């Protein structure tokens, strides 16, 4: 194993990746990650747990044929807008159509009827019902994906903590002196946020000359072969508490599944989350088995694990797993980093693992 230390530098995107408030984004580490892997010879790459898409975008920005994957439907749509899309933009007339309440349309009212006083005001819930429907009528899949991206980011930025983990609209509305949050951002109309995020997404679209794709699968079921597979699974801390992105962003998946949303909601939850499904990446007792299956699935690929120094399983456990599979491994460490809503520091760890 060859350890290396993080140093201060910046390798900018040639193209502009959009801003995001998404929890767990690797945006602050993406230049460091690319610096560590840029000398590896590879052309095809899979971002197996794509999230915001910032790593896949960095790979695309450097001419790689990238496949973005995320099991969450709303994330895969973001991947379609920013990674797979090479030349399609959302025009001013498209935007005006999306943001107009058309008198001839009988709009559904599911959000207004079911999410009153949970996440947004009555006026905002009505706006979401209208705009979501308008987006669904756009025929071009890439234009539609850009519109979805803008809607998702607008929803996130107007939420306290940028999450949908509890019923807490009152945090936005209560008249108190605040030591956190951004009330101005929360109170900015959806339309303004939407237009801003469309502009960012349009500026992010480019053709790198290679074929890029966005898919939505369980990473353990992906069959194609890739030169390099980047793996950034949901994080379980040393106390065994995992990050459940499906729970944090259930509302965005609900928007995607709008017509079937009522059948997916756990009505015993105050915030109307979606019914939970088992996820091996949130199970501290079985997550190592998940990693073992990934290593076996992509045994002929270079594997790049983005990890935390205090995660479960431990870094040593992962290294032992890789060595048992006859792989040669390098360890790279970032500086100590303090994460939002946490008092503890940890290091970002990059494990680069080569096949026999």
Residue ranges of model-derived segments:
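SAM-dependent methyltransferase catalytic-core segment centered on the flexible catalytic loop
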Residues: 236-300
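Conserved proline-anchored active-site loop of SAM-dependent methyltransferases
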Residues: 33, 45-59, 68-73, 224-245, ...
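SAM cofactor-binding core of SAM-dependent methyltransferases
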Residues: 44-107, 113-116, 130-136, 145-148, ...
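S-adenosyl-L-methionine
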Residues: 1-46, 54-61, 85
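Conserved Class I SAM-dependent methyltransferase catalytic core
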Residues: 275-326, 333-334
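SAM-dependent nucleic-acid methyltransferase catalytic core
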Residues: 9-10, 119-244, 260-271
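Class I S-adenosyl-L-methionine
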Residues: 315-356
